[in-house]
Amino acid sequence: MKTKLYLLTGFLGSGKTTLLLEMLKRLDNKKIGVIQNEIGKISIDGEILRNDDIQMVELNRGSIFCSCLKLNFVQALADMAEKDFEYLFVESSGIGDPSNLDEILKAVTVIAGDKYEFKGAICLADAINFENQLEEDEAVERQIKHCNMAIITKSDVTGDEGFEKVLNKIKEINPICRVEKSVNGVMDYSFLDEDLIQYKWAESEESTNSVETKPKTLFLNFEGEVEQEKLTAFLEDMTDDVYRMKGFFNLKGEGWNQVDVVGKKIDYKPCSDKGNSQLVFISKKGPAIIKKIFSSWEERVGLEMKLKN
């Protein structure tokens, strides 16, 4: 029996990992594999997904659709094909442009044989930030253009008017794709029993992902506790200059929390002990952001930290 293969796309912070966790819960009696891709070298989402019952491969430091990682992705798919999974989910980086997926799947077939049944590309669209993201990065349009199903997230915040705006934008880009809505991963998952590829709109094309277009990522490491109010002030200073910030911090009086920043929205969620606090920045300004990180951290937090590429 062939492995059912799904691709999850969606710009940074759209809720891919949340949705994937919900799908894994609903398939907990199945043999499942996950390929998880992040633009930086430290995998925050991989840490969230890690589970003894799930076999996971992490491909970091680039997009799996870029020449810098494409061959690694093909080989990972070929290797996973030998493990007789019932389902394999690929969660791509938020900046991933999947326009060349057909080419990649053909290469996997040459290496590993006809082991996969591709069920479809699912793209998540953040109702709060989608329109701004669409203007900022071409990958957002490509993700919608090449998806079979779009899932609009966070419409509980924007309401029906916000949902309709995003729906209309999606249909302008891809008139064929199926569109659903999800709030915090809650939705009808009956699509897992369907062939989403019937909703195909665009033909394969060259991905816009390249070494030259890869955004700068930086990693802040910090030992000890930090006050949530001070950390929040620092994060607020940085929101205009980043696509995304995410990580883990030991908050004074609160314990360990997962920190997630998309647009102006800052979320804290309790999590297990991670040893050292860390934060990933995906910069809109390239290396120019480094000076601001140091100056704002010193002003708002005032404790020693280390910043790495």
Give the label of every model feature segment.
Residues E136-E138:
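Charged helix-capping and loop-helix junction motifs
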Residues M56, S67-C68, G113, K169, ...:
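Short, intrinsically disordered/low-complexity patches at protein termini
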Residues Q36, A125, V261-G263, S283:
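Flexible glycine-/small-residue-rich
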Residues K2, R142, H146-S277, K285-N309:
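C-terminal accessory "lid"/substrate-recognition subdomains
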Residues E38, A121, V179, L231, ...:
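A residue-level signal for conserved active-site and pocket-lining positions in enzyme catalytic cores
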Residues F11, F65, F73, F85, ...:
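Phenylalanine-focused residue identity feature
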Residues K2-S14, T18-Q133:
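Nucleotide-state-sensitive switch-loop elements of NTP-binding domains
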Residues A121, V140-Q143:
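Small-molecule kinase domains that catalyze NTP-dependent phosphoryl transfer to phosphate-bearing small molecules
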